[in-house]
A protein has these predicted regions:
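Generic hydrophobic, helix-prone segments enriched in Leu/Val/Ile
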Residues: 1, 75-76, 139
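Short, small-residue-biased leader/transition segments that mark boundaries at the very start
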Residues: 1-7
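Extended, charge-rich alpha-helical scaffolding segments
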Residues: 8-92, 96-97
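Short terminal interaction segments
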Residues: 86-171
Length: 171
């Protein structure tokens, strides 16, 4: 198999991998939206289930990311490019002589980028919601602590009978 013949095969593998990655990210969107509802409702059991599902999808995505990196390394080698500088955009530029591959890659790249940006927006909202929820919990804890402290000191009366439950003995 010549280097020239390897490029179409590698491009096909890359396209399949990018499509699979994009589908996994699409699967994450409703999971993250469910997470938003669980955070807002402080539903800890739902959060546990969601985090398990997230981990499962992230593990699959991580695997595909590793496959994609290997394919991009192979493509960079075939094209004589620096693998560390090879991005999907630079690969699309390198494919000027193959406009069909260039167009397909650009379409997949755009879909993937749009999906990832949507996930980032949802994750940012979830992060903000979590921070607000934690601040509210901390505020409530402080109110409870201050209420307990102030109610403990208000038990004292002019005679100590309220504190000790008996009137002081007179001597």
């Amino acid at each position: 198999l010549s280097l020239h013949d390897a490029l179409p095969i590698l491009m096909e593998e890359l396209m399949e991998t990018l499509d699979a990655e994009e589908k996994l990210y699409q699967e994450l969107i409703p999971v993250e939206q469910e997470k938003t509802r669980a955070i807002a409702g402080t539903d800890l059991e739902a959060m546990r289930r969601i985090v398990e599902k997230e981990h499962e999808l992230v593990d699959k995505t991580q695997h595909l990311e590793n496959v994609r990196k290997r394919i991009v390394l192979d493509i960079a080698t075939v094209l004589g490019k620096d693998p560390d500088k090879m991005t999907l955009a630079s690969l699309a530029d390198a494919l000027k002589k193959q406009p069909e591959d260039q167009r397909k890659l650009q379409m997949v790249h755009d879909r993937l980028r749009k999906t990832v940006m949507q996930l980032q927006d949802i994750n940012q909202s979830n992060e903000n919601l979590l921070r607000e929820t934690m601040e509210m919990v901390e505020f409530n804890m402080n109110v409870i602590r201050s209420t307990r402290m102030s109610s403990g000191s208000s038990n004292y009366a002019s005679d100590a009978s309220e504190v000790y439950g008996t009137a002081p003995q007179q001597i």
